[in-house]
C-alpha cells in the first residue's frame, strides 16, 4: 500500500557522474504517495511492532487521525507535484521519504488486515445477482384463442377487430326469434330450410337483429353505423348463406320503393344460382326484387333490364359488376348492404380491379360519404388474414365472428377423415387402388354412394375418368373389384374440354342421380371446391393432395354439410406426401377428432395386372384417335 523506503545514497553516484554545467537534465521518477510494503521493508517494519500493538487498543481514534493525516499528506503531495516541474533537489525527496515513514509508524498490521476485511465485505456487498422480473399486472386475454402458432403470426389482419366467439352448442329453434323477425319471413325459413339454427346463424342473429330492429325504428338513416362491418370465418356447409340473407330480408321487408340496397358478390356462376335460390325462398310472399348478373347473359340485355327495373338485391360476380358500373347500369346511391361471399378467393384475384373500383363508386355515388355508410359482410371458410387486402375494403368498426378454437380453420363437425397410405413401389397402380378403395366403402355402405374425387389439373381429370371407365367395363375380370360387379357405376368428369352446357348437365345428373344409380362418381378440380352446395355427397376423395390447408378445407367441405355425416379419404403416396399432409393439419380444427389411417389389404393378382395394363393401352389408343380426329 505504501512506497518502499528511499535511500539517498543511491542518487549521489548518478549526480556525481553528470557532466559539469548540466543540472537535473533527467527528471526523477514520481514515487506514489502510497505503495504496498515490499519484502525489503520487513526488517524495519518489525521494529515498530510494539507501537503497533499499543495502537490496536485505540484503532478507532487512530483511524480518525489517519484520515486527517492522509488528507494533509494529499495536500502536501499536490505541492510536491507542482515543485517537480522545477529542477529536483535532495530536500524534496527526503521530505517525501519522511512523510512515508511517519505514516507507516502510525498504521499497524491490524489496521491493514481490517482494511482488507472491509474491502472484502464491500466486494461481497457489491456482488452481482440474477435479475428478477418486476411483478406485472395479469394480462386479460382469451386463452382459448391466443395460440402463438396461429393467431399471433397468421391473423395479424384481425388484431384490431372486436372478436365474437361461438361454438357448436349454439343451436336454437328459429321460433326463439319470433319477436325479432317478420312473421312471413319466419314462416319461409321454417318451411323452406330448417326449424333450428346453425351455430353461426345463432351468433350473427343474436348480435345483429336486436340492434338492427331498434335502430330502424329510431332512424333509418344511421342504422348502418350502429351495426358496423362483419367478418365471418366459418366452416363450409355451416349455413353462411342463410346467416347473411336473413338480416337483409328483415331490413328490406317493409321498403316502399324498390332501390338497389344490397349487392352480393360471389366468385362463380354456380354460386350465383345457389344464393339466388336461397333468397327467392326467403322472399316468397313479399314485393322484394332479386336479380342476377352473370356472363352467360347478354350484357346489353342486362343493362336494359337493370335500367328499367331497379332490383332490391343484386347477385353478381366481380367482373360483371365492374361492367355494369362502367355502363352506369346501376347506381350505389341507396346501397345499404355489401356482401362478399368466399372473400379469400375474391380478394386474392383482381377481377378487373373490382375492389378499388367499387370503393371509388361508393364515395362518388352516395350522398353520405362518411365511414360506415354501408354494412359490409365478409364471409369465408378460410377468411384471409392479409392486412393489406382487408384494408382495401375500408372496414368500419369490424366485428369478427369465429369459432372458439386455437386453430385457423374449422372442419365440419360430423366429418370423418381417413388416410390411405400407398407405398411408392405401388404408386403406378394408384387408379386401381382408388377403385379398390371404393369397393371397400361399398362393402360397408348399403345405400347408394355419391363420390366426389379431386385431382390436381384439368388433364388429370380427363385421363383418370376415362381410365376408370375402361377398367370398370372389364371389372368382371378383376379379383379386387368384385364388390363392383353387381353395381351400376357412373363416372364423369367436369373439365374445360366440355362445353358449359355439358358441364352443367353433368353436375345436375350428379346432384340428382336416378333411383337405380348405384355409384355416382364425379372427377373434378378445385373449381368445384368452393361454394357448391350439392346435397348428400357421401365421400370426398383427394386423389391428388391439396396444395394448402385452405384447399383442403374447401374440398372436404363438400361433404358433411348441414350437420349431416360425411367422409373424406386422402390417397398419400410415399413418405413425402404423408409429411406434407401432417403440415397441413397444424392449421385445422377437428373438434377433438383425428385423421384415422385406413389399412387396405391390396393384393394384386396377375389378372388384375393384365386388366390394368390393357386398360392403359386402350386409354393410349383413345387419346391417339381423339388427337387425329
Curated annotation (Swiss-Prot):
Residues 437-603 form the Helicase C-terminal domain. Its EC number is 3.6.4.13. Its main location: nucleus. It catalyses: ATP + H2O = ADP + phosphate + H(+). GO terms for molecular function: ATP binding; ATP hydrolysis activity; RNA binding; RNA helicase activity. Residues 1-130 are annotated as: Disordered. A motif (Q motif) lies at residues 197-205. Residues 72-84, 116-125 have a biased composition (Acidic residues). It is found in: Nucleus, Nucleolus. It comes from the Eukaryota. Residues 221-401 form the Helicase ATP-binding domain. The modification Phosphoserine is found at residues 73, 77-78. Pfam families: DEAD, Helicase_C. PROSITE patterns: DEAD_ATP_HELICASE, HELICASE_ATP_BIND_1, HELICASE_CTER. SMART domains: DEXDc (SM00487), HELICc (SM00490). A motif (DEAD box) lies at residues 341-344. Keywords: ATP-binding, Helicase, Hydrolase, Nucleotide-binding, Nucleus, Phosphoprotein, Ribosome biogenesis, RNA-binding, rRNA processing. Belongs to the DEAD box helicase family. DDX51/DBP6 subfamily. The Q motif is unique to and characteristic of the DEAD box family of RNA helicases and controls ATP binding and hydrolysis. Associated with pre-ribosomal particles. Interacts with DBP9 and RSA3. Together with NOP8, URB1, URB2 and RSA3, forms an RNA-independent complex, which is required during early maturation of nascent 60S ribosomal subunits. ATP-binding RNA helicase involved in the biogenesis of 60S ribosomal subunits and is required for the normal formation of 25S and 5.8S rRNAs. This is ATP-dependent RNA helicase DBP6. It comes from Saccharomyces cerevisiae (strain YJM789) (Baker's yeast).
Amino acid at each position: 500500500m505504501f512506497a518502499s523506503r528511499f535511500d539517498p545514497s543511491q542518487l549521489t553516484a548518478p549526480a556525481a557522474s553528470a557532466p559539469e554545467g548540466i543540472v537535473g537534465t533527467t527528471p526523477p521518477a514520481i514515487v506514489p504517495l502510497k505503495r504496498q510494503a515490499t519484502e525489503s521493508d520487513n526488517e524495519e517494519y518489525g521494529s515498530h511492532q510494539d507501537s503497533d500493538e499499543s495502537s490496536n487498543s485505540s484503532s478507532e481514534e487512530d483511524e480518525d487521525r489517519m484520515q486527517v493525516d492522509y488528507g494533509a499528506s494529499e495536500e502536501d503531495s499536490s505541492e510536491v507535484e507542482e515543485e517537480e516541474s522545477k529542477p529536483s533537489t535532495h530536500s524534496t525527496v527526503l521530505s517525501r521519504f519522511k512523510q512515508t515513514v511517519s505514516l507507516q509508524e502510525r498504521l499497524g498490521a491490524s489496521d491493514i488486515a481490517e482494511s482488507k476485511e472491509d474491502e472484502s465485505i464491500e466486494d461481497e456487498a457489491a456482488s452481482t445477482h440474477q435479475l428478477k422480473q418486476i411483478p406485472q399486472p395479469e394480462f386479460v386475454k382469451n386463452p382459448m384463442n391466443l395460440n402463438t402458432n396461429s393467431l399471433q403470426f397468421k391473423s395479424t389482419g384481425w388484431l384490431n377487430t372486436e372478436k365474437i366467439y361461438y361454438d357448436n352448442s349454439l343451436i336454437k329453434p328459429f321460433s326463439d326469434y319470433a319477436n325479432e323477425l317478420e312473421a312471413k319471413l319466419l314462416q319461409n325459413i321454417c318451411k323452406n330450410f330448417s326449424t333450428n339454427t346453425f351455430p353461426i346463424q345463432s351468433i350473427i342473429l343474436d348480435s345483429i337483429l336486436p340492434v338492427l330492429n331498434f335502430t330502424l325504428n329510431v332512424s333509418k338513416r344511421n342504422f348502418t353505423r350502429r351495426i358496423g362491418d362483419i367478418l365471418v370465418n366459418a366452416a363450409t356447409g355451416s349455413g353462411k348463406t342463410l346467416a347473411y340473407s336473413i338480416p337483409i330480408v328483415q331490413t328490406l321487408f317493409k321498403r316502399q320503393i324498390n332501390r338497389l340496397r344490397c349487392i352480393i358478390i360471389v366468385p362463380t356462376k354456380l354460386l350465383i344460382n345457389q344464393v339466388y335460390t336461397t333468397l327467392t325462398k326467403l322472399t316468397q310472399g313479399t314485393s322484394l326484387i332479386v336479380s342476377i348478373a352473370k356472363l352467360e347473359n347478354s350484357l346489353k340485355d342486362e343493362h336494359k333490364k337493370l335500367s328499367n327495373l331497379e332490383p332490391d338485391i343484386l347477385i353478381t360476380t366481380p367482373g360483371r359488376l365492374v361492367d355494369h358500373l362502367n355502363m352506369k347500369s346501376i347506381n350505389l346511391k341507396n346501397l345499404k348492404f355489401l356482401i362478399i361471399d368466399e372473400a379469400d378467393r375474391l380478394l386474392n384475384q383482381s377481377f378487373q380491379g373490382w375492389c378499388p373500383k367499387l370503393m371509388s363508386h361508393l364515395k362518388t355515388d352516395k350522398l353520405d360519404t362518411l365511414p360506415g355508410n354501408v354494412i359490409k359482410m365478409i364471409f369465408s371458410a378460410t377468411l384471409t388474414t392479409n392486412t393489406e387486402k382487408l384494408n382495401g375494403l375500408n372496414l368500419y368498426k369490424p366485428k369478427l365472428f369465429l369459432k372458439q378454437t386455437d386453430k385457423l380453420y374449422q372442419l365440419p363437425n360430423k366429418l370423418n377423415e381417413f388416410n390411405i397410405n400407398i407405398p411408392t413401389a405401388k404408386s403406378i397402380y394408384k387408379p386401381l387402388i382408388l377403385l379398390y378403395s371404393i369397393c371397400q366403402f361399398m362393402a360397408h355402405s348399403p345405400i347408394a354412394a355419391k363420390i366426389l374425387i379431386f385431382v390436381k389439373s384439368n388433364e388429370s381429370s380427363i385421363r383418370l375418368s376415362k381410365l376408370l371407365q375402361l377398367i370398370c367395363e372389364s371389372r368382371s375380370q378383376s379379383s379386387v373389384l368384385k364388390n363392383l360387379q353387381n353395381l351400376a357405376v357412373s363416372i364423369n368428369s367436369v373439365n374445360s374440354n366440355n362445353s358449359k352446357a355439358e358441364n352443367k348437365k353433368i353436375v345436375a345428373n350428379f346432384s340428382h342421380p336416378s333411383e337405380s344409380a348405384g355409384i355416382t362418381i364425379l372427377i373434378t378440380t378445385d373449381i368445384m371446391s368452393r361454394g357448391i352446395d350439392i346435397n348428400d355427397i357421401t365421400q370426398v376423395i383427394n386423389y391428388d393432395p391439396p396444395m394448402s390447408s385452405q384447399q383442403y378445407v374447401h374440398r372436404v367441405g363438400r361433404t358433411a354439410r348441414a350437420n349431416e355425416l360425411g367422409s373424406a379419404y386422402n390417397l398419400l403416396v410415399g413418405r413425402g406426401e404423408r409429411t406434407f399432409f401432417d403440415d397441413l393439419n397444424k392449421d385445422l380444427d377437428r373438434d377433438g377428432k383425428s385423421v384415422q389411417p385406413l389399412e387396405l389389404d391390396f393384393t394384386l393378382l396377375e389378372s388384375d395386372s393384365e386388366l390394368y395394363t390393357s386398360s392403359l393401352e386402350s386409354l393410349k389408343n383413345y387419346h391417339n384417335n381423339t388427337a387425329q380426329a
